[in-house]
From Swiss-Prot:
Lineage per the UniProt record: Bacteria, Bacillati, Actinomycetota, Actinomycetes, Kitasatosporales
Protein's name according to its UniProt entry: HTH-type transcriptional regulator TcmR
Keywords: Antibiotic biosynthesis, DNA-binding, Repressor, Transcription, Transcription regulation
Region described as Disordered: spans on this chain: 1-25
Domain HTH tetR-type: 26-86
Biological pathway: Antibiotic biosynthesis; tetracenomycin C biosynthesis
Alphabetized InterPro entries for the sequence: DNA-bd_HTH_TetR-type_CS, Homeodomain-like_sf, HTH-type_TetR-like_transc_reg, HTH_TetR, MftR_C
Function per UniProt: Represses transcription of the divergently oriented tcmR and tcmA (tetracenomycin C resistance and export) genes by binding to an intergenic operator region. This binding is inhibited by tetracenomycin C.
Pfam families attached to this UniProt entry: TetR_C_14, TetR_N
Skewed-composition ranges (Polar residues): 1-16
Entry annotated with the keyword DNA-binding: yes
DNA-binding region(s), chain positions: 49-68
GO biological process, one term: antibiotic biosynthetic process
Amino acid sequence: MDSAETDTPSTRSTPNGPGLRQRKLRRTRDQLIREALELFLAQGYEHTTVEQIAEAVEVHPRTFFRHFASKEEVALTPISAIDEAFLAALEVRPAGENPLQAMSGAFRAVLGRVRDGELEGVDGALHMAMMRLVERTPGLLAEYLRRSEEMEGRLARIIAAREGVDLDDDFRPRFIVAVFKAVGRVVSREWYLRADTDLEALSVAFESALDSLRPELFADWRRPGA
């Protein structure tokens, strides 16, 4: 894994999928993520070293750093994968949906992929357990919240583009996204802390929480012609 590798017909990507080298790199990365999360859960984030993670996968620590800049990055990688999948799902929601409908639909779609094991590098039960660890690890929680704030900005830009409004002049995309994210955090946190791994029930609870909001939040405020 640490030796230099060059592209050959057996390692080069093809139209039919990644080559052997890419598959090996992907497999090593996935193993590093899983072993890291399991070690974090077993002995605590602070007490787990990069050397221990690398040893569990039987690679040199420098291989770890070829994939991740830090323990913090590997710990939050599954969360980032879910966020990216959510953004991609939102981009293709039907144009006629209002912002909350679009974000809710994207959330359901991604949660379904996690539940069915279809989101690469994300194990649903392991992710839920890791989120409980994030909640009680100050350093990880601070970085998670920082990334969540960045995510809100990206979501707001997508919503503004969908609705045909200028994000610099119209606060509603940021407002709607903040409401959506707040509901998601409150509902999800309850699931994490009580160790509930039923993702279908989580989806239902999230929808119920959104439905309890004032009807005005669900109104269609698209600019005519957008």
